[in-house]
């Protein structure tokens, strides 16, 4: 009986759980059908919808938005409950709209002071980012006192931020990034005591930043970069004990690095670049326990104070374009977690410190270009480097053969040094090498046996390379050969990392251009200023991804290969200052992206290809050739060209053939009189006076011969 009651009790408990589950589940199922939306909230949303147009995606949508689409387009269509509209969230009990997320919604138009958004009094979250809104929005939202999250980034909002911004006292997140806000930041910003993130970058703010910022004790992120703030950093920033990120770059802040930054013990990222800071870098900066990223570039700092004991947390140190002098400071070798070191464009001298071998476990990007460093490249100190740039120094010797073991190396730039070596064909073993720059050194010899599978940019110009290039030379240059899809191009990234991006200088379209960032789809080949001879390899036509091709200032001969017409992505072509002859291949006229070309100072002749690209070239691109002609050249370049209709032009091949013909004609012309003269003389010798002939011709010749023999 006891077992029966136990069993009955168990059943009762089980049924109770089932009933409870069903009742809860039915509530869940019924919830979407409940009409929560309050009428005045619905009206405000519908009016807001009519205030703006749905247009094209904003310029940044395709990059930053996951699924951009017009969210307001479906509002009101067969659904009267605004709480179920896309981008709208309501309070489950009261039906008040508390969140409005219209980011990436293709919305276009100008905000006015009476915008219906001001009637959504209970909003806590408002996200209008990644649209094309214009005008002044602040007067429309200054009374939304419940807001905790406000994101207006990536729009075209303008005007000043009013002092009434301080009324939004519950804000924890304020993002005005990438707009056109102007004027001074009001001191009432200090009333936002709950704020954790303040993002004002990429606007037109100016003047001194308000010292009231020191009252935001919860602030973790302060981003002010790309504005026109000036003066010294407010000392009250030293009170922000929770601050982890401080970005002040590209303003007009000035002075020395203030000591109160040493109070920011939680700081992980500090960017002071592109301002007017000066003096020495204080030693205490390297003792901040959590500091991971420091950017001091583009200021006028002159040196480093040595720290007592640097913290090992430092991962990225960028100090380019300052006035640093002397040797590279040795304390850098103690930053064992360093992944990026950029000290380019300074006045450092001496050797590259061997102690940098301490960094080999983590260092992936090293940039020391544009200094006065001397000696050779150290061996065996960089194991996992992805990019090495030591261009524009005074380095000597040879490339260390240990480079062939740098299996992660993607970029190698040693341009404008005094390196005296043969072509490093052994670098073909590097599986990830994409950029190789050897220009302006003393490299010499042939460059055969080179096949690079990943190489996309190679610049070996202005060296002493020589010899011929086999016809199949470029067959194995895979990265320049495979045509990328439109999707590949749209998804192209820049070489480098989040904290550092590779750069280089390249001759493009006749101008020395600096690539501040290198796209992963950019391709270029520059062999100019060497002593290459023979024909241009026909396999050049396999490099269908090539954008820039420069073979100028060599001794190439023969015809320009028609296979160049297959370089469908080509934008710049320079084959000037060679010994090329024949016609410019008509196929080149079909290259629709080719905007700059130079065929000058060769022995080219014949009809210049048609096509709009050729019509827009300057006369200097064709000057000093044997006889190029075409309607444009005859009309616009008469000073350097004679129309072919008035003159017959000959290539070196036809000149040789003509010389042969002329020689045969001359021989024939001389042959007939010779026969006549010979017969006449013979007739005289036989029938008339042989004594006279001997007297006239024979004795003088014999006398001369005997005189020569005697002597």
Swiss-Prot record:
The LRR repeats are found at 120-143, 144-168, 170-192, 193-216, 218-240, 241-266, 268-288, 289-316, 317-334, 335-358, 360-384, 386-406, 407-430, 431-452, 453-476, 519-543, 544-567, 568-591, 593-616
Q: Which GO terms describe its cellular component?
A: plasma membrane
Q: What is its main location?
A: membrane
**According to the record, which residues are glycosylated?**
78, 114, 143, 167, 191, 239, 242, 252, 263, 295, 323, 347, 362, 372, 420, 466, 550, 590, 598
- Is Transmembrane one of the keywords UniProt gives this record? yes
Compartments in which it is found: Cell membrane
Q: Which UniProt keywords apply?
A: Cell membrane, Glycoprotein, Leucine-rich repeat, Membrane, Receptor, Repeat, Signal, Transmembrane, Transmembrane helix
- Spans through the membrane: 667-687
Q: Which residues lie on this side of the membrane: Cytoplasmic?
A: 688-711
Look up and give the membrane topology term: Single-pass type I membrane protein
Q: Give the matching PANTHER family.
A: DNA DAMAGE-REPAIR/TOLERATION PROTEIN DRT100 (PTHR48060), NON-SPECIFIC SERINE_THREONINE PROTEIN KINASE (PTHR48060:SF24)
What this protein is called in its record is Receptor-like protein 43
Q: Which organism is it from?
A: Arabidopsis thaliana
């Amino acid at each position: 009986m006891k077992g029966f009651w136990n069993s009955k009790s168990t059943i009762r408990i089980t049924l109770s759980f089932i009933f409870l589950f069903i009742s809860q589940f039915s509530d869940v199922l019924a919830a979407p059908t409940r009409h929560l939306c309050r009428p005045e909230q619905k009206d405000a949303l519908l009016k807001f919808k009519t205030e703006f147009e749905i247009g094209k995606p904003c310029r940044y949508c395709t990059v930053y938005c996951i699924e951009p689409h017009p969210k307001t387009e479906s509002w009101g269509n067969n659904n009267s409950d605004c709480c179920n509209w896309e981008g709208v969230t309501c309070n489950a009990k009261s039906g008040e709209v508390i969140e409005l997320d219209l980011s990436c919604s293709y919305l276009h138009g100008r905000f006015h002071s009476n915008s219906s958004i001001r009637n959504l009094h209970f909003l806590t979250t408002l996200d209008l980012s990644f649209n094309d809104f214009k005008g002044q929005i602040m007067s429309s939202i200054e009374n939304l006192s419940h807001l905790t999250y406000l994101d207006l980034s990536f729009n075209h909002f303008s005007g000043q931020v009013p002092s009434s911004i301080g009324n939004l006292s519950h804000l924890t997140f304020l993002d005005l990034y990438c707009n056109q806000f102007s004027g001074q930041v009001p001191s009432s910003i200090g009333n936002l005591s709950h704020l954790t993130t303040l993002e004002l970058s990429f606007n037109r703010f100016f003047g001194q930043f308000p010292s009231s910022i020191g009252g935001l004790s919860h602030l973790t992120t302060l981003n002010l970069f790309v504005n026109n703030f000036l003066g010294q950093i407010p000392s009250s920033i030293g009170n922000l004990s929770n601050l982890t990120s401080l970005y002040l770059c590209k303003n007009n802040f000035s002075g020395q690095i203030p000591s109160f930054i040493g109070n920011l013990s939680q700081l992980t990222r500090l960017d002071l670049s592109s301002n007017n800071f000066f003096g020495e870098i204080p030693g205490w900066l390297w003792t901040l326990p959590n500091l991971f990223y420091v950017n001091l570039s583009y200021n006028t700092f002159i040196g480093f104070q040595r720290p007592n004991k640097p913290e090992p947390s430092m991962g990225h140190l960028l100090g380019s374009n300052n006035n640093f002098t002397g040797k590279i400071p040795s304390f850098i070798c103690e930053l064992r977690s360093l992944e990026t070191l950029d000290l380019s464009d300074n006045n450092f001298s001496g050797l590259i410190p061997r102690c940098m071998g301490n960094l080999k476990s983590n260092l992936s990007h090293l940039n020391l270009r544009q200094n006065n460093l001397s000696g050779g490249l150290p061996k065996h100190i960089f194991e996992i480097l992805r990019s090495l740039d030591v261009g524009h120094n005074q380095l000597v010797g040879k490339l260390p053969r240990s480079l062939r073991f740098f299996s992660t190396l993607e970029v190698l730039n040693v341009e404008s040094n005094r390196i005296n070596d043969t072509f490093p064909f052994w670098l073909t073993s590097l599986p990830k090498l994409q950029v190789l720059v050897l220009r302006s050194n003393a490299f010499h010899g042939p460059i055969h046996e080179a096949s690079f599978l990943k190489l996309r940019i190679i610049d070996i110009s202005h060296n002493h390379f020589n010899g011929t290039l086999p016809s199949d030379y470029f067959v194995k240059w895979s990265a320049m050969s495979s045509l990328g899809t439109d999707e590949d191009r749209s998804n192209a990234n820049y070489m480098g990392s989040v904290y550092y991006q590779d750069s280089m200088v390249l001759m493009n379209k006749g101008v020395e251009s600096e690539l501040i960032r290198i796209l992963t789809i950019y391709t270029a080949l520059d062999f100019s200023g060497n002593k290459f001879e023979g024909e241009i390899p026909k396999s050049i036509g396999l490099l269908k991804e090539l954008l820039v091709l420069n073979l100028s200032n060599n001794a190439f001969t023969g015809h320009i290969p028609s296979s160049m017409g297959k370089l469908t992505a080509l934008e710049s072509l320079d084959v000037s200052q060679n010994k090329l002859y024949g016609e410019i291949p008509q196929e080149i006229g079909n290259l629709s992206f080719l905007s700059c070309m130079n065929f000058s100072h060769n022995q080219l002749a014949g009809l210049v290809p048609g096509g709009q690209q050729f019509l827009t070239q300057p006369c200097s691109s064709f000057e000093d050739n044997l006889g190029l002609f075409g309607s444009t050249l005859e009309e616009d370049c008469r000073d350097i060209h004679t129309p072919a209709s008035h003159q017959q032009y000959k290539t070196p091949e036809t000149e040789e053939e003509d010389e042969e013909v002329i020689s045969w004609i001359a021989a024939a012309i001389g042959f007939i009189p010779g026969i006549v003269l010979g017969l006449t003389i013979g007739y005289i010798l036989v029938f008339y006076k042989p004594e006279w002939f001997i007297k006239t011709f024979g004795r003088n010749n014999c006398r001369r011969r005997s005189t020569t023999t005697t002597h």
